[in-house]
Regions:
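Short beta-strand segments within Ig-like beta-sandwich modules, predominantly Fibronectin type-III
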Residues: 19-25
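Short, hydrophobic beta-strand segments
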Residues: 30-35, 126-145
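Short proline/glycine-enriched turn/loop motifs at strand-loop junctions of beta-rich domains
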Residues: 2-8, 97, 146
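Beta-strand signatures of extracellular beta-sandwich domains
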Residues: 8-12, 43, 101-105
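Beta-strand-rich structural segments
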Residues: 2-3, 43-44, 78-96, 102, ...
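Extracellular Ig-like/FN3 beta-sandwich strand-entry sites
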Residues: 35-39, 78-80, 146-148
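Short aromatic-acidic-glycine turn motif
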Residues: 63-65, 105-121
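Edge beta-strands of extracellular beta-sandwich domains
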Residues: 49-61, 158-167
């Protein structure tokens, strides 16, 4: 399924067109495409044939790791730092089917929230462990007064750490 507010959509699989559809008022085009690893790209066009946008999905590799990415490269002392935790491959492509309970530890700050976007998430957001939802979770850390904060994430199989400079 491709959702777009456009006149038509093309679907590309690994560099070749596998379908074209005109869209109606529901902004939905359905395609049936056999699975093939690689790159699936939807390109939307207006009535004059000008490109409006594109969206790409890429198959993740075999290797799995936890990636921790702060929303901003620095944080002010006392302010909140949002750190996205994801299961990814070696190229940083999210692996939405990977799932685990990630334990978070913070040095140089305070963990104020940890969770995911799952609508039936049963754990407390104040806990230091969160299950991933479609391969992702989010940690919210209040920066301390030191020069940096470090978040370590570990699920018992994979681990990562990220350090964020703290400014005053």
């Amino acid at each position: 399924e491709v959702y777009a507010r456009a006149a038509r959509v093309e679907l590309w699989l690994n560099g070749r067109v596998v379908g074209r559809k005109a869209l109606k008022n529901d902004c939905l085009a359905k395609f049936s495409v056999p699975y093939e690893p690689g790159r699936l790209e939807a390109v939307s066009y207006d009535a004059q044939g000008c490109e409006l946008g594109r969206c790409t999905l890429t198959t993740a590799g075999q290797q799995t790791q936890i990636t921790a990415g702060p929303e901003q490269s620095t944080v002010q002392a006392g302010h909140l730092c949002y750190i996205r935790l994801r299961y990814t491959d070696e190229k940083g492509i999210t692996k939405p089917l990977a799932r685990g309970n990630i334990k978070v530890e913070v040095d140089g700050g305070t963990l104020v929230g940890l969770g995911n976007a799952c609508p039936y998430h049963e754990r407390s957001y104040l806990d230091c462990v969160a299950d991933t939802y479609y391969g992702e979770a989010l940690a919210i850390v209040r920066a301390g007064e030191g020069s940096s904060l470090t978040l370590t994430a570990d699920d018992g199989m994979y681990s990562t750490a990220v350090t964020v400079p703290v400014t005053r």
